[in-house]
Amino acid sequence: KDEGYINQLAQTFCDGQLYESLHSMLTENEPGSSRRSNLYYNGKIKGWSIDFNADALWTDTKNKQTAQESVSGSVNHHADRTVTTHDTKRNELYAAKLVVSHPVPKGELSLGAEYSHNKRNTTYFNAEGIIGNDEAMIKEGATSAFVEYVKKFNNLQMQAGLRYEHVGFNYYDAGKWVAEQSKTYHN
């Protein structure tokens, strides 16, 4: 468990006089976990060159921060308060790419596909209600397919290809899909 401690003093002056003094003592901890996985293959099967790579990553962090604040000055006189926040983040990432290629007369033909998916959940909660709470989720995904032909002319090389890509981004606020911030593209 990683734990941090911050002790800070902020003072505001107006016309050379102390207007407000804010003393904050913060403690925070960030326990978390991370897991990752990778799978790959690079080789040949019946004259086809195959290059495959896939990754997965999962992270989970939780942070609790407690601030003991003491405010004094000519406007507020003296006030003490505790501000407690809980912040959680969860991430999932999956990505894969496959390229297969084969020699053809006077060149090489390659076919491939890519895929990625990312999901992020965040929550922010203030027990005392001093700071607004927040809960958001983002889902991103991309899928593509491509074909490419390569031909060599002595020291020169010519490439021609086509690629199609679908990209989606979805944003959720407190569990509700937000259309204005969610986008989809087909290229």
Regions found by a protein language model. Give the residues of each.
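Primarily recognizes Gram-negative and organellar outer-membrane beta-barrels
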Residues: K1-N187
